[in-house]
Amino acid sequence: MTPDAARPLTGVRIVEISSFVAVPLAGMTLAQLGAEVIRVDPIGGAADYHRWPLTDSGESIYWAGLNKGKRSVAADMRSPDGQDLVQRLIADSGVLITNVAGRQWHSYEALTRLRPDLIHVEISGRADGGTGVDYTVNAGVGFPMVTGPAELAAPVNHVLPAWDVACGVYAALAVVTALRHRDATGHGQQIGIPLENVALATAGNLSFLTEAMVNGNARERIGNSVYGQYGQDFTSSDGASFMVVALTGRHFRDLTELTGTTKAVAALADTLGADFADEGERYRHREALTGVFTEWFSAHTGEEIAAALKETSVLWDRYQSFAEVVTDERVTANPMFTALSQPRIGEYLAPGLPMSIDGSYPPATPAPALGDDTAAVLCDWLGLTPEEISALTESGTVA
């Protein structure tokens, strides 16, 4: 495999004007695929430049995590000169990804006057043009009402910014498909991705919305159970927690044999008039089944449970904290992770692209500091002389 085979977007140039999660993730994904991605920020940094978590010296671990492999330009995007300069960078690249909506100077209409075949991908909060972030979009699409303990009445937010992550992947996909379209037709595209629509589409595609429309009822809150299947968390005698899932008949039979409950489960089925070969029946009577299985889990240590589960087809894993995960072989021996020396942050294992291409994982490379590449990009992309760049720096147009 040639080096370019693992970086299929080599030669593509992209300008990113962004903050927070979705667009930075899209830009980083495209960079990991080989594109030259220039993140353009205001002088002093966008709203996410100092976002937590921070190092003891105040550097943003978060910012470094979502901007690996990019180049950084800092410009005064409120000034006409700064806007003109960034417009020229966008026109040169032919691709803009942004979640900074409502800025006329980098709108599709304004930029296509400079680059008619421009690919313009803009993430917004809501389809009606309103503002929204992952945490507020999530509140309005139903998921907090089915998250958390079954007995709880109040909404529960999930910690993972799921809609931002999904939206970022959609944005990267949009760029790749638009590049394909431009190669085939010579035309660019204007692509809008409302964050709210990503959440609503997911809720619909996974049947949460459709169930309410067709059956007339909302999904119930079931805690750590798995809807429509048998899946439950269990705790060992020494306090270790496990998630155990039996999706198939074989999984379920192995679980009953492992726990020595085959006869007890058969007796329960007779009492309830249930057929546990049916996944719906296993789900419907999940609480009774959990009561049968709990005795075995609570009588064994975490190590004993893990060793026993490894010998079966049952799907499972042990709950771990992030501090435990980083010492696990799934990180330390995973070829997706690269030992990265990140300036101002330190050395750590950083994930690259989470997919192998012809057996190779594109490795992680460091994130730039704000404005690290301003002069080089202005020279390489726009052909500005050192004197011209110096004048722009002295005037406060770039940094």
Predicted regions and their residues:
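N-terminal helix-loop segment corresponding to the beta1-alpha1 unit
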Residues: 1-184, 369, 375-399
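Terminal low-complexity tails and localization/encapsulation signals of metabolic enzymes
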Residues: 1-13, 235-237, 324-399
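Short, well-structured beta-strand/strand-turn elements
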Residues: 37, 310-324, 384-389
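Conserved Rossmann-fold dehydrogenase catalytic segment
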Residues: 152-160, 183-199, 221-224, 274-275
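Mid-domain beta-loop-alpha active-site segment that forms a flexible
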Residues: 161-176, 195-205, 247-251
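Oxidoreductase and adenylate-handling cofactor-binding alpha/beta cores
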Residues: 168-188, 205-212, 256-268
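Active-site Gly/Thr loop motif
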Residues: 215-231, 299
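Aromatic-enriched alpha-helical interface/lid elements that frame and gate functional surfaces
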Residues: 230-312, 316
